[in-house]
Amino acid sequence: MPDDPVARLENTHRRMGDELTALEVAAHAGDRQGLDMALDFFASAAKRHHEDEEASLFPRLRGDAGLVPLLDGLASEHRDHEAARREIEELVRGNADTRAIAASVARFVAMLRAHIEKEDRELLPAAERMLDAETREAVAEEMRGRRRGR
C-alpha cells in the first residue's frame, strides 16, 4: 500500500530519532534556535503522530485483550512526553542555565527513545498482524485528514 499507516508511523519514529539527536546537540551547545526548532517539531509533528496512534490505531487494536495494557501504557507515556516537552520549553523561555536545559533534555530523550523502541518492538508488529487492507486504508485516511486539518 503506497500510504501504509504502519510504515508512516515507522518513518515518523525515524524522524523523531533524528530530532532527538538534534535536540541533544542543541541543548549541549546552548543553541536556543536549535532547541526551538526541535521543540517545535515535538509540539507539532510528534503530537500529531501520537494523535494518529491514539485516535486511529489503538482503538483498532483493543480487540486483542492482551494488547490493552500496552496501549494504555503507551497513551500514558504520551502524556508524560508532552509534560516533559513543556518543561524544556519553560526552561528555554526562562533562559535557564544550559546544564539545567541539557539535563531536562536528557530525561526527555531517554524517555522518548525507550518509548519508540517499545512501539517498534511491540505495537507496530501487532498492527502489521492485525490490520487488514481495508482497515489500513481507513487508518491512512484518518491520518491524511489530520494533516489536512480535519
Segments (PLM) and residue ranges:
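Small-residue-biased structural context
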Residues: 1-150
